[in-house]
UniProtKB/Swiss-Prot annotation:
Organism per entry: Craspedocephalus gramineus (Bamboo pit viper)
The protein's name in its UniProt record: Acidic phospholipase A2 2
Keyword Repeat: no
Annotated positions binding Ca(2+): Y27, G29, G31, D48
One annotated GO molecular function: calcium ion binding
GO cellular component terms, semicolon-separated: extracellular region
Family: Belongs to the phospholipase A2 family. Group II subfamily. D49 sub-subfamily.
Swiss-Prot/TrEMBL catalytic activity: a 1,2-diacyl-sn-glycero-3-phosphocholine + H2O = a 1-acyl-sn-glycero-3-phosphocholine + a fatty acid + H(+)
Gene3D superfamilies: Phospholipase A2 domain (1.20.90.10)
Length: 122
């Protein structure tokens, strides 16, 4: 669920997902359309695509099981849908961490007109 995703981002990327990514680029926070503005926004685009492939549960509400082992996130549990959501969140948290240096405040709260291009396929 979104609270677990927030905690995962904090654990992996060392920053708040709500503060840094809730309204960033064309894909972070709000649905999404257009071209990802940078690598951090692309993390959100890929995360949206990942959620779109999940079947059997609501990715934003599904409560999953994960642990932090030697700094790595390990998704667990027997429910394949919840585990898939966990893997989507894990990949995004790692992507945010790996692209912290590309984050640019100019993409925070950008006008929707900047996101009018046709979206690329997942």
């Amino acid at each position: 669920n979104l609270l677990q995703f927030e905690n995962m981002i904090r654990n992996v990327a060392g920053r708040s997902g709500i503060w840094w990514y809730s309204d960033y680029g064309c894909y972070c926070g709000k649905g999404g359309h257009g071209r990802p503005q940078d690598a951090s926004d692309r993390c959100c685009f890929v995360h949206d695509c990942c959620y779109g492939k999940v079947n059997g549960c609501n990715p934003k509400k599904a409560v999953y099981i994960y642990s932090l082992e030697n700094g790595d996130i390990v998704c667990g549990g027997d429910d394949p849908c919840r585990k898939e959501v966990c893997e989507c969140d894990k990949a995004a948290a790692i992507c945010f961490r790996d692209n912290k240096d590309t984050y640019d405040n100019k993409y925070w709260n950008i006008p929707s007109e900047n996101c009018q291009e046709e979206s690329e396929p997942c």
